[in-house]
């Protein structure tokens, strides 16, 4: 507990909010080539490279990620969820916030089933998260 004298000297400070997805907080004025402070829930971007990376210590896998240049000029690394994908260089994708816990530096997810990204094939459960259409009912 601070004394009155300490509060007079220093005062209290409000801790500033720090975004977990900072690239979604910036826009771009393309006419003036200046950054603007416009937040967005998703952003469009173009894949510059698609690769696999290995996760942090206790886990072992080859996680699919893409390097994406967004419409605001920022380049980020985004995770490609689901089994199998059709992304390659120059694919236009939609990204959303959301980190991948075991991949350092990956703070964004690619939205499946939007723009050039195909949905996951033969997906029965959690279809909306993976852009999969409802399967046609089997004929009797």
UniProtKB/Swiss-Prot annotation:
Would you say which domain of life the source belongs to? Bacteria
Q: Which InterPro entries match?
A: NA-bd_OB-fold, Ribosomal_uS12, Ribosomal_uS12_bac
Q: Name one GO molecular function term.
A: rRNA binding
One Gene Ontology term from the biological process aspect of the record: translation
Alphabetic keyword roster = Methylation, Ribonucleoprotein, Ribosomal protein, RNA-binding, rRNA-binding, tRNA-binding
Q: Where is the composition biased (Basic residues)?
A: 130-140
Any one Gene Ontology cellular component term annotated for this protein? small ribosomal subunit
Region annotation Disordered: where it falls in the sequence: 121-140
One Pfam family of this chain: Ribosom_S12_S23
Q: Which residues carry this modification: 3-methylthioaspartic acid?
A: 102
Q: Which family does it belong to?
A: Belongs to the universal ribosomal protein uS12 family.
Stated role? With S4 and S5 plays an important role in translational accuracy.
Instruction: Quote the subunit structure annotation.
Output: Part of the 30S ribosomal subunit. Contacts proteins S8 and S17. May interact with IF1 in the 30S initiation complex.
Protein name, entry field = Small ribosomal subunit protein uS12
Organism (species): Alkaliphilus oremlandii (strain OhILAs) (Clostridium oremlandii (strain OhILAs))
Q: Which gene encodes it?
A: rpsL
